[in-house]
């Protein structure tokens, strides 16, 4: 089953106006499938390279030699964070033949990808984030109940056997903690990262208290903050900042923390069935996070998202505001 992604139209739009597009999102979210779905729609021959394949990685050890003859192609480079030096090589190639739609760069870790692209490809690149499947995207295929409980990762959602679906998420979590960050040059202690991740699941939808997390896990606050940045940069968590325009001291300025995928949240909480979720104390927080995430995924990046909370603790999650207007 191939579910049409709402980001497809935006990707094609960017390729008509920018020399390069960086498509960001966590692993298994559907970036490769989306990129391959535009083959034949760009008006150019397309070449696909995967930096996890030794043969493709070798081709780009001297990128100018391989890529210069492809100036009239659209070149898709998957897992580009594996080759951060590539950004520097792309800049002169783009400037030599500056036309829209030359490169699509797929990345699974935003800090390294954005840092490399922003420093070297400024003015040449557009960014597009791909989240797990949103509720509007799966309507007609899955109920909102299934989507809420299993989350939006395509392979998980398309797995009819619930224990197998959760096993896929467990493997995803372990792989991210034990292999992915290390492969990107990040020094982490996987058991501690997993403990923090599970602790965040129990604090889902709450105000982020780094000192409390540090004391509970036995990690110093500096390490906790670094791990929080890695989880957020890997698209696993989201910090929702407070809205405080014109409200001064009445507002609490600490962010709220959410796990971005509801299925991953339920797996970390060891909730194995929808009935177990409904009877669990975390049900309300899970639903809040699910609604917040659907609002953000559906409304898109042109809004800023905040929660509103006064000293009397009356609050409205996911207040979105642009430069000239706001909605609650």
Language model features: what each stretch is:
Residues 23:
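Hydrophobic anchor at the beta1->P-loop junction of P-loop NTPases
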Residues 111-126, 142:
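Short regulatory helix/loop adjacent to the ATP-binding pocket of P-loop NTPases
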Residues 34, 38:
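Hydrophobic positions on the alpha1 helix immediately C-terminal to the Walker A/P-loop
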Residues 15, 162-318:
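Accessory nucleic acid-recognition modules appended to NTPase machines
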Residues 31:
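Conserved lysine of the Walker
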Residues 1-12:
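N-terminal pre-Walker A segment at the start of P-loop NTPase domains
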Residues 87-111, 118-119:
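Conserved catalytic/switch belt of AAA+ P-loop NTPases
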Residues 44-74:
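Short glycine-rich substrate-engagement loop in P-loop NTPases that contacts/grips substrate
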């Amino acid at each position: 089953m191939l579910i049409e992604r709402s980001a497809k139209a935006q990707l094609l739009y960017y390729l008509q106006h920018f020399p390069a597009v960086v498509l960001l999102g966590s692993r298994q979210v559907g970036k490769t499938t989306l990129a391959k779905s535009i083959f034949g729609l760009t008006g150019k021959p397309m070449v696909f390279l995967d930096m996890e394949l030794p043969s493709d990685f070798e081709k780009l050890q001297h990128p100018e030699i391989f890529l210069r003859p492809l100036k009239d192609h659209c070149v898709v480079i998957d897992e580009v964070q594996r080759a951060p030096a590539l950004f520097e090589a792309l800049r002169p190639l783009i400037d030599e033949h500056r036309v829209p739609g030359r490169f699509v760069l797929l990345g699974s870790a935003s800090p390294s990808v954005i840092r490399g692209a922003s420093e070297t490809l400024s003015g040449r690149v557009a960014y597009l984030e791909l989240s797990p499947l949103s509720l509007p995207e799966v309507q007609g295929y899955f109920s909102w109940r299934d989507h809420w409980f299993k989350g939006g990762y395509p392979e998980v959602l398309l797995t009819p056997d619930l224990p197998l679906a959760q096993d896929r998420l467990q493997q995803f979590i372990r792989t991210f903690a034990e292999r992915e960050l290390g492969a990107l040059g990040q020094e982490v202690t996987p058991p501690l990262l997993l403990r923090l991740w599970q602790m965040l699941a129990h604090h889902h939808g709450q105000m982020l208290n780094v000192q409390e997390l540090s004391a509970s896990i036995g990690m110093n606050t500096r390490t906790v903050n670094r791990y929080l940045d890695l989880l957020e940069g890997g698209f696993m968590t989201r910090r929702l900042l407070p809205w405080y325009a014109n409200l001064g001291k009445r507002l609490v300025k600490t962010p709220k923390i959410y796990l971005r995928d509801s299925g991953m949240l339920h797996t970390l909480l060891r909730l194995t069935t929808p009935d177990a979720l409904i009877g669990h104390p975390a049900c309300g927080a899970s639903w809040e996070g699910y609604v917040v995430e659907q609002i953000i995924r559906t409304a898109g990046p042109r809004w800023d998202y905040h929660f509103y909370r006064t000293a009397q603790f009356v609050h409205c999650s996911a207040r979105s505001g642009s430069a000239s207007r706001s909605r609650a």
